[in-house]
Amino acid sequence: PWTYLGHQRFMQIAKAAGATVRVMPMDLGKVFPISGGLPLGKRAPQRQAYRLVEMARFSKHLNMPMHLKPKFFPVAGDDAARVIIAVDLHHGTQAAMAITGAILKAVWAQERDIADTQVLGELLVEQNLDAACLAQATQADVQERYTQYTQRAIDVGLFGAPTYVIEDEMYWGQDRLDFVARHLQR
């Protein structure tokens, strides 16, 4: 939810700063066990409850529609991550950021199942991208990048999403975007 809540603001901050963005989806299922993170269902009940409070606060504060308990969450995000990588490779970072936003919105605002390749194809078309990216997302080079991005995340000590890294300085969470903006203004 936090990546969804921060995505548009991050794009605006990066654009205003003229920053170069590298989109690097990672497999949180592999990152969490190494970094001590727990999947949502394994967290203590009070943490799960407070997460919903914070989501509602940020959704209202940012005026972003959001289902606190979307129909398709948790959801397997590997195919969606590979689609983002395929779009980045074949259409560039701006297109990858656009499809990322569409995928996040699909889960958190529209209750669409991003584990369904038909839904991913629809999202590509809605972003004026060729649905051929679905086939490209299954190619070995895309999977290799996904694996590399996940390993890189582990190697640099990332432990959650969203994480923004600027000049080797890490900012975790959409609530750190003010710090991201300040760093980019240096």
Mark where each language-model region is:
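C-terminal cap of thioredoxin/glutaredoxin-like
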Residues: P1-M24, L89, A98, A102-R186
